[in-house]
Amino acid sequence: MINDKLVHFLIQNYDDILRAPLSGQLKDVYSLYISGGYDDEMQKLRNDKDEVLQFEQFWNDLQDIIFATPQSIQFDQNLLVADRPEKIVYLDVFSLKILYNKFHAFYYTLKSSSSSCEEKVSSLTTKPEADSEKDQLLGRLLGVLNWDVNVSNQGLPREQLSNRLQNLLREKPSSFQLAKERAKYTTEVIEYIPICSDYSHASLLSTSVYIVNNKIVSLQWSKISACQENHPGLIECIQSKIHFIPNIKPQTDISLGDCSYLDTCHKLNTCRYIHYLQYIPSCLQERADRETASENKRIRSNVSIPFYTLGNCSAHCIKKALPAQWIRCDVRKFDFRVLGKFSVVIADPAWNIHMNLPYGTCNDIELLGLPLHELQDEGIIFLWVTGRAIELGKESLNNWGYNVINEVSWIKTNQLGRTIVTGRTGHWLNHSKEHLLVGLKGNPKWINKHIDVDLIVSMTRETSRKPDELYGIAERLAGTHARKLEIFGRDHNTRPGWFTIGNQLTGNCIYEMDVERKYQEFMKSKTGTSHTGTKKIDKKQPSKLQQQHQQQYWNNMDMGSGKYYAEAKQNPMNQKHTPFESKQQQKQQFQTLNNLYFAQ
């Protein structure tokens, strides 16, 4: 049976039903129908039955109307409700009036269908001009938005849409998950050997080791076997874990406890505190090396399968990374345009922290004046800062055109794998971490996000040496074959795929021909001036006496008795940094230096 009261309601309120804030939502239309008092029978149902049965009756009445006048009510199917649509998108008022006139003759004056449609479109597209209508619409909208969150409204469409929107915002793109899986299956691992946490094992081993020059030479297995009876599992633990054995010396006072500096102590032979030596059985080390090599071989085979290539070079599977490249230079006076553009830059400036350090430092003005903005059009930069220079580092990044997007903390651990809370780790307070600012320039689409965390837990090494884990983070962000630069680097910072510059490097090594050409032009323009940078070098020919000195010098060079070859023989590290310099090229360089010397 047709519910004529519902038909009358749809005719009288079709404009409000289709427009915001109701927007045709069935359950909101139902609520308006009930609250308007259009149907006494429905009100009776409301008092006697639950809301689900009421809404079912309302839906059945709509179905009866559609059966009587097809296409008079049209819905938009939504996936939130599987069994029925949830939204009315169109009401044919003309057809509904005809239907209502069947029950109440001549109640509505009928117009043409086209005029009815025009009336509907006009009402939907025309904005209310009167202030009262605007206020009414605003009040209805605020009423929809400001519902009581303590009341269970899970059945209302607006609550369902809100939950759906929140879930959609919380959902991470598939690219994040794929990038994380790619990093998991293609990143090579390093060997890991667990550390024994039983202090009694270290005490027993300290009485069974033979130490010479702060090195463990051998173990007395007879004593260890005797201790096995009272300490079951001791031998198995020795063969499967790392042990730190106390290095007891005549001057050691056990009551003082562990040294704050442990293996970094500068007075190791005279310090009265307890120090430790690391013991790893050779069989355990070999087994760990084999397992690591086998795992990395399997991982390298995964790299050859390009199952996800977003953010990587198109030839990632077959392309090999460039060998390590470096230039020894004074960064403050170097022309960064020689290097070109990079995707990732790491900078570890020697901030002036007002302490006696074994290396030179730069003042703030010099660091702020570095033209780092020339190195990237878009990309990411990692800037190491001290506690004093955090705000200065952020200001520098902003001046270079970067936005500070994150801050990574390096949690330092000592020889025993514990966090550092004492020792030479700060000026005013002992620092247990260091700060790394992350800056972003431009809007690079190729960065792989949400792979690593903003914490690095790693052991300290030489003074000012930073953890190697940062290189892995940078390569996973930008890709293995992206151009990467490290500024203020040293010999231990050079690595394949990276370009390193700094004044503590040994020699030069450049594989990129374009950079080599620009560097030669830069050096040529630089050597065309005197050491003061103002006086031009006189290009006159050397005198006869000067030529004799030069000839004698080259003879010594050819015989290998020159100072350069003597030093190179004593320090073979100097030889590996000149792969492009033939003997003739070396002569040309020394010839240039001699000309400069004899011209003065």
Curated annotation (Swiss-Prot):
Catalytic activity, EC: 2.1.1.348
- Subcellular localization: Cytoplasm; Nucleus, Nucleolus
Report keywords, A-Z. Answer: Cytoplasm, Meiosis, Methyltransferase, Nucleus, RNA-binding, S-adenosyl-L-methionine, Sporulation, Transferase
In terms of PROSITE patterns, this protein maps to:
MT_A70
A GO CC term assigned to this protein in UniProt: cytoplasm
Q: What happens when the gene is disrupted?
A: Severely decreases N6-methyladenosine (m6A) levels following meiotic induction. Increases the rate of degradation of KAR4 and MUM2 protein.
Where does the source fall among the domains of life?
Eukaryota
Single GO BP term: negative regulation of pseudohyphal growth
> Per its record, what triggers expression of this gene product?
In response to starvation conditions.
The UniProt catalytic activity note for this protein reads: an adenosine in mRNA + S-adenosyl-L-methionine = an N(6)-methyladenosine in mRNA + S-adenosyl-L-homocysteine + H(+)
Q: What does this protein do?
A: Catalytic component of the MIS complex, a complex that mediates N6-methyladenosine (m6A) methylation of meiotic mRNAs and is required for initiation of meiosis, progression through the meiotic divisions and sporulation. M6A, takes place on the adenosine of 5'-[AG]GAC-3' consensus sites of some mRNAs. Positive regulator for IME2.
Q: Tell me how this protein assembles.
A: Component of the MIS (mRNA N6-methyladenosine (m6A) methylation) complex, at least composed of IME4, KAR4, MUM2, SLZ1, and VIR1. Interacts with VIR1.
Q: Which family is annotated? A: Belongs to the MT-A70-like family.
Q: What is this protein called?
A: N(6)-adenosine-methyltransferase IME4
